[in-house]
Amino acid sequence: MGSQETNLPPHVLIFPLPIQGHVNSMLRLAELLCLAELDITFIVSEFSHSRLIKHTNVASRFARYPGFQFQPISDGLPDDHPRAGERVMDILPSTKNVTGPLFKQMMVENKCFSSATRRPITCIIADGVLSFAGDFAQEKGIPLIYFRTVSACSFWACFCMPELIESGDIPIKGNGMDLIVKSVPGMETFLRRRDLPGFCRVNDINEPKLQILKTETRQTTRAQAAILNTFEDLEGPILSQIRKHMPRLFTIGPSHSHLTSRLETKNIKTLISSGSFWEEDRSCVDWLDAQPPRSVLYVSFGSITVVTRDQLLEFWYGLVNSGQRFLWVMRPDSIMGKDGQSQIPADLEEGTKARGYMVGWAPQEEVLNHPAIGGFLTHSGWNSTLESIVAGVPMICWPYFADQMINSRFVSEIWKIGLDMKDTCDRETIVKMVRELMEIRKDEFLQRADHMAKLAKEAVSEGGSSYSNLDGLVDYIKSLII
């Protein structure tokens, strides 16, 4: 090794699954590592990259880090593929069969992205579901770190998949959805079959999506280290279970709040770092400015969820009939069928004009921190859950699939900062839950949510668990330089 290369910083390759929640979470990790003066090559799908450049400040945000570079690659799907709803799962075989070989070719042709000003890749931080990246790392002798973008509780339940199959809890059949699951250590008293990750809802244990989940989760242990976007005070008991199998585990979350904390420490002007694939309608912030404190229910089901027209109407009637103010994000592609919002009943239109506001996409982090927001009706995606926790906003959870099922159970049963509305979608239940969160038990939920928000912010402040763990991660990466 020449003397010039000896003085170069570590060079980390970061590779997320190309869907919004995963990309967003790993972009925050990339910026945190940039702040520690590491060089970063960020593998991003061409589709994701074009959306980020079009709809976010990502170009200006990373321009201040000369050691950062994007490296676009195909995700193997056609441009008109929705990448949402049930079809979002198409991304897994596509990345394995198309992106995987392209990635290997790219790494070889670019000599692991080494140059006169950049050392070869020091380590690969890959999304935990991209085992082909792990295969390449092992083949080339490059240290591997997996980043799991889901909650610790979801990861652990998936890790216990073989035991769940052996015990007969999977596949879930008949009317046994409320039976307590005993095969996930640390959750034996409260986890029901209906709370297991959505991929467990299959008729046959040989179903491909279940087998993919099982294989991808178990292979995580081959990595030299793992990263989770959570914090010790939130999921400590579950983290203790995971560390029995993966002792070098770095919890660095909530990453969006951690990034803000680090930027403030360095006296860098902080702008909320959106990673949205959709154009944000900021008019909703002006509307919120005119509403009383803690009076508005924010409604958003994330970047993947799709609803039927019947479900749309049940939610709409429930929100209007609750008598509460609401801000509702309705993605352009979030309604099944072509008729979508056509022929909306007049009473819904009138009720929305009186107390509601609807946009195609919102600056969510900013919205959740707005003083007018008093609750969040959410799909329980992990990024949204953490953003709500940091903002001190109680939740009503209507999970759609994947890790969202178990996240919603922890929100309601363990952390007690919200209500779980999974597997139901009728207007009477929605009215009841909205009123319970926003009126009847409002003070109780706000008090608990405020306490959890303080714990989250302490974790990412200097001396906090996540702050110290990120320092430890950086030191570990530096130790990998040969």
UniProtKB/Swiss-Prot annotation:
Residues annotated to bind an anthocyanidin: 22, 402
Record's subcellular location: Nucleus; Cytoplasm, Cytosol
EC number: 2.4.1.323
Mutant lacking the gene: phenotype: Large decline in secologanin and monoterpene indole alkaloids (MIAs) accumulation.
GO molecular function annotations of the record: 7-deoxyloganetic acid glucosyltransferase activity; quercetin 3-O-glucosyltransferase activity; quercetin 7-O-glucosyltransferase activity
Enzyme class: transferase
Record-annotated active site: 22 (proton acceptor), 127 (charge relay)
Reaction(s) this enzyme catalyzes, per UniProt: 7-deoxyloganetate + UDP-alpha-D-glucose = 7-deoxyloganate + UDP + H(+)
Pathway recorded for this protein: Alkaloid biosynthesis
UniProt note on tissues of expression: Expressed in the leaf internal phloem-associated parenchyma (IPAP) inside the mesophyll. Mostly observed in leaves, roots and stems, and, to a lower extent, in flowers.
Induction comment from the UniProt entry of this chain: By jasmonic acid (MeJA).
Residues where UDP-alpha-D-glucose binds: 149, 362, 364, 379, 382-384, 387, 403-404
Keywords: Cytoplasm, Glycosyltransferase, Nucleus, Transferase
Domain of life: Eukaryota
GO CC, any one term: nucleus
InterPro entries registered for this protein in UniProt: UDP_glucos_trans, UDP_glycos_trans_CS
Known role: Component of the seco-iridoid and derivatives monoterpenoid indole alkaloids (MIAs, e.g. vincristine, quinine, and strychnine) biosynthesis pathway. Catalyzes the glucosylation of 7-deoxyloganetic acid to form 7-deoxyloganic acid using UDP-glucose as the sugar donor. Inactive with loganetic acid, loganetin, iridodial, iridotrial, 8-OH-geraniol, jasmonic acid, gibberellic acid, indole acetic acid, salicylic acid, abscisic acid, zeatin and luteolin.
Family affiliation: Belongs to the UDP-glycosyltransferase family.
Protein name per its UniProtKB record: 7-deoxyloganetic acid glucosyl transferase
Taxonomic source organism: Catharanthus roseus
Lineage: Eukaryota, Viridiplantae, Streptophyta, Embryophyta, Tracheophyta
